[in-house]
Amino acid sequence: MDVVWLYGSRAKGTEQPNSDFDLAVAFHSFPDDDWELRLQPELLAQSWSDQLGLADGIISVVDINHIPIQLAMGIVLKGETITVKNTLRLIREEHRITSMWELDHLHHRRHYG
C-alpha cells in the first residue's frame, strides 16, 4: 500500500460506537487476475479484522482506483490521509481524481445544464 485514507463517519467525527472504519487504499501492486484484483480490498479488510480481533464488517476497504469518481473526490476532500508511504503517489492520486472529477463535472454541465 502506498496511501491509506480514512473516510466516512470516523473521519467526520460523527461515528457511533458501532460504526465501521471506512478506508480507501492506493495499492502498491496489482494482481494480474481480474478476480484477484476485485478481491484485493476485501482480503485486506479481512486480514486487518483478523489481526485486530474485530468482527467481520467493522473494517471496510475500497481501492481508490476502482470506485466511482464522486466517492473518490469525497475521500480526497473530506477524508483523512492516515498512511503515506509514497508522497508522489499521494499527489498523483489527488491530481488524477481531481482532474477526472472536473472533466466529469464539465461534461455534465455542458450537456445537462
Go through each PLM region and give its residues:
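Catalytic core of pol beta-like nucleotidyltransferases
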Residues: D2-V3, K12-P17, F30, W35-G113
